Swiss-Prot record:
Gene3D superfamilies: NADH:ubiquinone/plastoquinone oxidoreductase, chain 3 (1.20.58.1610). This is NADH-quinone oxidoreductase subunit A. Belongs to the complex I subunit 3 family. It holds the Pfam family Oxidored_q4. It catalyses: a quinone + NADH + 5 H(+)(in) = a quinol + NAD(+) + 4 H(+)(out). The chain crosses the membrane at residues 16-36, 68-88, 98-118. The lineage of its organism: Bacteria, Pseudomonadati, Pseudomonadota, Gammaproteobacteria, Enterobacterales. NDH-1 is composed of 13 different subunits. Subunits NuoA, H, J, K, L, M, N constitute the membrane sector of the complex. The gene is nuoA. InterPro entries: NAD(P)H_OxRDtase_bac/plastid, NADH_UbQ/plastoQ_OxRdtase_su3, NDAH_ubi_oxred_su3_sf.
Amino acid sequence: MSMSTSTEVIAHHWAFGIFLIVAIGLCCLMLVGAWFLGGRARARYKNTPFESGIDSVGTARLRLSAKFYLVAMFFVIFDVEALYLFAWSTSVREVGWLGFIEAAIFILVLLAGLVYLVRIGALEWTPSRSRRERLNTEEAGSLTNRHTQ
């Protein structure tokens, strides 16, 4: 006796369906429980920030330098690349020399990207002088070195 296609699908995926129903139910239960059990502030100062008894001065918004976001993006990018290298390292015997060559090319591309980031100054935290000023300073230093030799 053969089962119909829909019965086979249900037989194979019933556990996932139950998991999905329980997960959604648990989320709803926590939201409803927090709504019933949570405290309610119905005062005039409900939406003002708590400053430990001190009157707040100025705005609560902070301006962060874009360098923080760049470092975070570089971290994520290089972290994902490390994940790829870890996956490669676990299967190094199966992929053989071809996999090794591909990983070496991948690492060289990463190094080229890192060199590019250093060259454009994306990793410099100090206030930078203009490129023209740096070049003039380097040229002046090399000229004085030539004259002293």
